[in-house]
């Protein structure tokens, strides 16, 4: 897998993983990059991506059990949670920065998820001038109203994120998107090939393509780049990040010094602000 000390083995009810310092589901769920990692009363979580869902429960020694076949874990959930990347190596490269050392201590279990591009486009359009509970509620309503039922876990029904075709021409008012509704409707008019081609573009071209779309500015484009295309050099800047750069670095911070994982640095910084 990676240079980190990782335990990954089959157990009777799924796959046990243990990554001691760089994988914490609560930190990931609270990080603001995903809105469908659902906490359960037993301390577990349900993750959903595309047409797959999995229950994840606490395992031994701080690990987690993925309740799914090993092949599904390998093909779906390892990529989704970016488990093959060496986040410990990323952290070691930040060790010379006192602020980032503190950020690692506070939120070193975060990983940058490899999420569905289309879902991220809609989600981060919804996120504009919004807070996490409202974003989560709007996304849940879209899934429950227009998505495909995927199954029930612990008495709760889970749904896929609706495809462009499932949203096209629909009344989205139940999700209370406000002015963002027209942007989402416009996105749904693009055919699947548009999003496929976007994934093939280099970073600069993809960012320009996204910013050219109505309803997507620079910050949303960079969020989509990071969370929907896994372009790890993307460094989304909002008012909080800009304030941190001013306060901690006196306005002088160049994300390119962390080439290949600048987006991870951004996520850690947000946790510590």
Where are these regions (language model features)?
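HhH-family (HhH-GPD) DNA N-glycosylase catalytic core used in base-excision repair
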Residues: 1-271
